[in-house]
Structure formats: C-alpha cells, structure tokens
Amino acid sequence: MGLDMMQDNHLSAIPFKDNNRLSRTGTKMYVVNLMPGYNGIQYIAEKYALEKPVSVTVELVYSTDTFKPLKKNRENRVESYDFEINNAFDRGEIVGGFGYIEYTEPTKNKLIIMTLKDILKRKPDKASGEFWGGKKTAWEKGQKVEVETEGWFEEMCLKTVKREVYSAKNM
C-alpha cells in the first residue's frame, strides 16, 4: 500500500497480548497489529481515490473565528465556505472543525463539518488523559497519584477531523 513506518503517523506497530494462543512453553503469545495513523489514512485515500482531489483543507474552528458554510443550492452551484481567523493569538475554545475537498470539477467539491460534540463522540471511552487531557496516573514519592494534565487536545481534535475527512465515505 506504500505506507512507511519511518514517516510520522503513517503506520504504527501495536503489540497485543493474545490470551487465546499459547506458545509451546505455555506462555501467552503477543500479536503485532499494523495500524495506519492519520497521515497513512490520508496517503491511502489520496493515492487510491477514484477521483483524486486537487486540494484538501482541514481546519479547527475556534470560538473567536468566523466560519460560514456555503452549501450547494440552486443559487450556489459550488459547495464552499468563508473562514476568517479574527484573533490569531487568542482564538478561544475549539467549537468544531471542517474539511474541504476540492476537485478539478468544482461542482463535486465537498464540505465536511464536525461540531465539537461530533469530535468528542469519536473519543474512546478509556482515552488516555496524556493525549486528550484530563487525569492520568503518575508516580510521586513511590506512590500512585492522579494528576491533571493538559494533554494534546487540539492535536487529537485535528487528528479526528482528518480521519473523518479522509474516510472512505468522503473521498
């Protein structure tokens, strides 16, 4: 498929303990799953698309930004959007994200919009606080304690929007 483990977020090797299989010595075996990351999903979607997009834009929308979707209708032949960053250095809280897929034939352009609720719906139930922010377990003075971490919330939201935009149903 052309994915490269040396590229960021292309392909990751994830080991799992397989409790159903035993080795000859009777110990549990491990299985390695090769999981494509969001850049790998993007690569596959663009490389194997029936109609290759000219450009794909993926952005997060913050509370101080101005975002206006322009959906296709009888007066507007091409789906599009207006997006303006009003305060680049203090954009506020994330309110959602969008992806815009542009084709050579403009009438095929597609706008995918995700609210913050849609993004958080895709967050795993047992998501690590280290990534999404929140509480994580740490060791301090030989004891397990829960600490609050900022995590990588923006990056996780952007990754989630990218996964949706580059999914098979949208490309």
What are these regions (language model features)?
Residues 1-170:
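Binding-interface segments
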